[in-house]
């Protein structure tokens, strides 16, 4: 009996252990499975429906984003087409002289004629001002546009983008002239407070006069090199234009550009081309030259003496200039350039021969003590010609014979030009 009882107890324990093991395995499998969502089919259908709806919405968004630029471009293109029709083509260019009211003005064309015209409503009124360049309809000359930031092409050419390479060291002698132009042009631009403390006004401009080849243009180039100011160079003949009113307009444009790029220096070479003495004449061309000079006088009187604009003029014939042009208040300082003396000639020869290989036979003193009058340009021409003679004979050194031959050739050409001028 006892044996049967022990066997039953062992069987019950084994059964209990097996049940526990099965329960543990079943619980482990249930924990590893994902939770089930009921009803499963309904949730899947809803998920697919929402996914399809999101795809359709993104597709619609892409289509709308592609259509909006087309609509805006179509609208802008149609507006541009209407504006172009109103403007007309091709467009002419004129100058706005004055306003009559908000919708009308007076303009001048390239031939000098004045017109009372309409100003279109689509033109930017903030850009319109007397003297600006405007676009005109080719049929009725109405103002249809404004050229912004324009600069006359001729004035743009006059403006030197790169400073000249000449310096004061390249000028032989002329110490007095250099000092005067420094006091008149360079010092007022670099140290204007000195004149204010002294209680005086600096000169508006200077005029350089003297014989040809004495260094007037060279000194002006040296001033442009020494200062960081904008340098505008113009020859007097460039201010003489074919059509009526173009010369004075070019003078106004020249001073306007100088004011825009201040501090600036205006160098007018050969001023006698437009600054000659006035007299009664029936010639239309001569009257136009006189009008150009009157505009130059007006500009010299107009700008303030303490602003950053200086004027340098140069001429060979100061006696031919109109007294109103060179009177004090307009051109306050007159600097004369004479023929160089022996010491100055020696300095000029040393400057031009400093980079040349000279033979031992070269004696500059013999060239200086000659009876002929030598200007700075003549000395430079002699040195250049002597170097070319040496090159012609395949030599690297320049001899005294080369200088003598060069001097004879230069003076022969000079005398020939003088003789031709007497009988022309």
Curated annotation (Swiss-Prot):
Pfam family, any one: AAA_lid_3
Basic and acidic residues composition bias: residue spans: 1-11
Protein localization: Cytoplasm; Nucleus
UniProt keyword annotations, A-Z: ATP-binding, Cytoplasm, Nucleotide-binding, Nucleus, Proteasome
Listed GO MF terms: ATP binding; ATP hydrolysis activity
One GO CC annotation: cytoplasm
Gene3D superfamilies (alphabetical): 1.10.8.60, Nucleic acid-binding proteins, P-loop containing nucleotide triphosphate hydrolases
Binding, ATP: 210-217
Chain residue ranges for the region called Disordered: 1-33
Keyword Nucleotide-binding: yes
Listed InterPro entries: 26S_Proteasome_ATPase, AAA+_ATPase, AAA_lid_3, ATPase_AAA_core, ATPase_AAA_CS, NA-bd_OB-fold, P-loop_NTPase, Prot_ATP_ID_OB_2nd
Annotated SMART domains: AAA
Main location: cytoplasm
UniProt KW Amino-acid biosynthesis keyword: no
Highest taxon above the source species: Eukaryota
Signal peptide feature range: none
Subunit: The 26S proteasome consists of a 20S proteasome core and two 19S regulatory subunits. The 20S proteasome core is composed of 28 subunits that are arranged in four stacked rings, resulting in a barrel-shaped structure. The two end rings are each formed by seven alpha subunits, and the two central rings are each formed by seven beta subunits. The catalytic chamber with the active sites is on the inside of the barrel.
Family the entry assigns: Belongs to the AAA ATPase family.
Function: Acts as a regulatory subunit of the 26S proteasome which degrades poly-ubiquitinated proteins in the cytoplasm and in the nucleus. It is essential for the regulated turnover of proteins and for the removal of misfolded proteins. The proteasome is a multicatalytic proteinase complex that is characterized by its ability to cleave peptides with Arg, Phe, Tyr, Leu, and Glu adjacent to the leaving group at neutral or slightly basic pH.
Protein name: 26S proteasome regulatory subunit 4 homolog
Source species: Encephalitozoon cuniculi (strain GB-M1) (Microsporidian parasite)
Gene: RPT2
């Amino acid at each position: 009996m006892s044996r049967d009882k022990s066997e039953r107890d062992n069987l019950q324990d084994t059964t209990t252990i097996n049940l526990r093991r099965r329960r543990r395995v079943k619980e482990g499998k249930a924990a590893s499975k994902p939770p089930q969502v009921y009803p499963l089919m309904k949730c899947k259908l809803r998920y697919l429906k929402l996914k399809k709806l999101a795809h359709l919405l993104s597709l619609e968004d892409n289509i709308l984003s592609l259509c909006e630029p087309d609509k805006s471009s179509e609208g802008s293109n149609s507006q541009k087409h209407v504006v172009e029709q109103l403007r007309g083509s091709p467009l002419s260019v004129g100058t706005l002289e004055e306003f009559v009211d908000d919708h009308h003005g007076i303009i001048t064309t390239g031939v000098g004629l004045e017109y009372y015209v309409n100003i279109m409503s689509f033109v930017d009124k903030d850009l319109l001002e007397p003297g600006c360049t405007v676009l005109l309809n080719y049929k009725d000359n109405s103002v249809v546009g404004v050229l912004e930031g324009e600069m006359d092409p001729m004035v743009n050419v006059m403006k030197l983008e790169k400073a000249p390479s000449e310096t004061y060291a390249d000028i032989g002698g002329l110490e007095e002239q250099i000092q005067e132009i420094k006091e008149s042009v360079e010092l007022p631009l670099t140290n204007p407070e000195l004149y204010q403390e002294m209680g005086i006004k600096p000169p508006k401009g200077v005029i350089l006069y003297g014989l040809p080849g004495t260094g007037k243009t060279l000194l002006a180039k040296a001033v442009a090199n020494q200062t960081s100011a904008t340098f505008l160079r113009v020859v007097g003949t460039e201010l003489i234009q074919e059509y009526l009113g173009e010369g004075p307009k070019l003078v106004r444009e020249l001073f306007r550009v100088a004011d825009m790029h201040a501090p600036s220096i205006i160098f007018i070479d050969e001023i006698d081309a437009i600054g000659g003495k006035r007299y009664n004449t029936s010639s239309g061309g001569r009257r136009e030259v006189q009008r150009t000079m009157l505009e130059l006088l007006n500009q010299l009187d107009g700008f303030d003496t303490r602003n950053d604009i200086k004027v340098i003029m140069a001429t060979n014939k100061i006696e031919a200039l109109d007294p109103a042009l060179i009177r004090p208040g307009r051109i306050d300082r007159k600097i004369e350039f004479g023929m160089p003396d022996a010491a100055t000639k020696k300095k000029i020869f040393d400057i031009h021969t400093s980079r040349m290989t000279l033979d031992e036979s070269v004696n500059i003193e013999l060239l200086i003590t000659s009876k002929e009058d030598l200007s700075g340009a003549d000395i430079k021409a002699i040195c250049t010609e002597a170097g070319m003679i040496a090159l012609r004979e395949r030599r690297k050194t320049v001899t005294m014979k080369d200088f003598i031959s060069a001097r004879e050739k230069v003076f022969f050409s000079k005398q020939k030009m003088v003789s031709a001028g007497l009988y022309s």
